[in-house]
């Protein structure tokens, strides 16, 4: 997670890699994008043994914007895989995703406050 909005990351295109940490951390590819509204990430060929997607969607609501996040994972069959993924990995992912969303909220609110502080016409 970045601590601030990074200008160099504001023009993503389909096919770009979104890495989950510094290399060699795994990554997903941008599969679809509607700028300013929706970003769809998906498993990269050879990068993951299970198909997965992660969608970020902005929905205007009264007085602001709601960020809707959905993820889907194709877990391998078997009791051992179920224990590893659903019992161990999913709760860890929940905590990490929640921290990421809180960071996004904090940066968005700080950015909105900074914009509001700029005099009109400046």
List the model feature ranges, each with a label.
Residues 121:
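Short terminal or interdomain "cap/linker" segment that borders an active site or interface and mediates
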Residues 1-68, 73-81, 85, 98-118:
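Glycine-rich portal/gate segments that line the openings of hydrophobic small-molecule binding cavities
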Residues 87-91:
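Active-site rim elements
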């Amino acid at each position: 997670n970045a601590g601030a909005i990074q200008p160099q990351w504001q023009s993503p295109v389909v096919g770009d890699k979104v890495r989950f940490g510094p290399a060699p951390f795994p990554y997903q590819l941008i599969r679809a994008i509607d700028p300013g509204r929706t970003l769809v990430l998906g498993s990269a060929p050879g990068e993951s043994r299970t198909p997965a997607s992660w969608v970020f969607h902005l929905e205007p609501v009264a007085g602001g914007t709601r960020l809707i996040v959905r993820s889907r994972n194709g877990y391998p069959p078997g009791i051992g895989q179920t224990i590893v993924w659903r019992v161990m990995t999913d709760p860890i992912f929940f905590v990490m995703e929640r921290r990421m969303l809180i960071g996004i909220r904090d940066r968005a609110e700080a950015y909105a406050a900074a914009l509001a502080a700029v005099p009109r016409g400046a």
